[in-house]
């Protein structure tokens, strides 16, 4: 059987497994996922999509608009979130196909095949379709945008990046990475930026006409940054930034400006503390890869107030070897994940060949270090590129040892 048919068959099996996991383990109620449902129902109670005009002052903050409105559409049409879970499970399969195509175009068919193999053996790639988290649609649109741009369809690439931003507001990382990758292709990346600008401006103008606010993506960055550094500053001077969420005299845009001011005011006198937190944020982002393993928890554990408890690194260390099914999968996933990360780091010697992938990871990590807060979920959008680099290193290592 020729290679292309084998790859299609593998991707098909991978997609079917995603659907089987959804059927067998059901919905995973991550806190954010549950929050999206609440926000969607609230907006629909006003017969609108998120954010409803009447809630501009009562909303604590503006969350991931695209993800919430996907829930709203599903609830409005089907009175259920199951259709989205099925769509997300299918998107996982399409995403693998795009990862394969990007890798093939950049690095050749041999590396693409190894990338595909590493990808399907990576446990964290299973189960994402059992929740409403933003990673699945965001990664799909970003990767499809990258692929379109690699193939020379820059305008379409920009449009897809704009769609990704609607689900999670960090598509700019992938746009910047591609601009650096093709730094001399001015016409190409200008078209990419125009496509992106068209989508976000269209969404923004539609919301301005309907709701009186120019909004096209989530506004949680300054809130998270201000709260993170307040929490990790031993002095705890002034009020907690999260207290602003209860101020119903401010719109979510005004709250966002307040959080920005709070953080910048804090930064003036705490530059040392800010710099000291940078390696901690990076460590928190990459040290663990247990989030998606919650899919395999029992229903009883999923219903706990802190669902992640049994899968935390500390709990895993203390429980060994008396593990549950989910904990054994988590252990395997961690070993596999660390193997990917190690081979990715070793691929630095091939950075000239792996420029695009390394640009994505470096820019994304820089954003987390300077403008974000450390969280295990935050490395997920970069894993396809990390896996490509890992595959390239493994392929070259194998050649050298033969």
Q: What is each PLM-predicted segment?
A:
Residues 21-50, 189-261, 265, 288:
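Juxtamembrane membrane-water interface segments immediately following transmembrane helices
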Residues 61, 65-73, 77-94, 128, ...:
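Loop-to-helix entry region of an early transmembrane alpha helix in multi-pass inner-membrane enzymes
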Residues 98-101, 118, 137-154, 161, ...:
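Specific aromatic-rich, kink-prone transmembrane helix
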Residues 83, 280-358, 362:
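Membrane-interface anchor segments at the N-terminal boundary of transmembrane helices
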Residues 11-15, 112-121, 147, 161-165:
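Short helix- or helix-capping micro-motifs
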Residues 83-106, 144, 342-346:
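Transmembrane-helix motifs of polytopic, lipid-linked glycan transferases
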Residues 23-34, 38, 45-69, 73-76, ...:
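Membrane-proximal lumenal/periplasmic loop motifs of glycosylation machinery
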Residues 124-137:
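Short acidic/glycine- and proline-prone juxtamembrane loop motifs at membrane-interface regions
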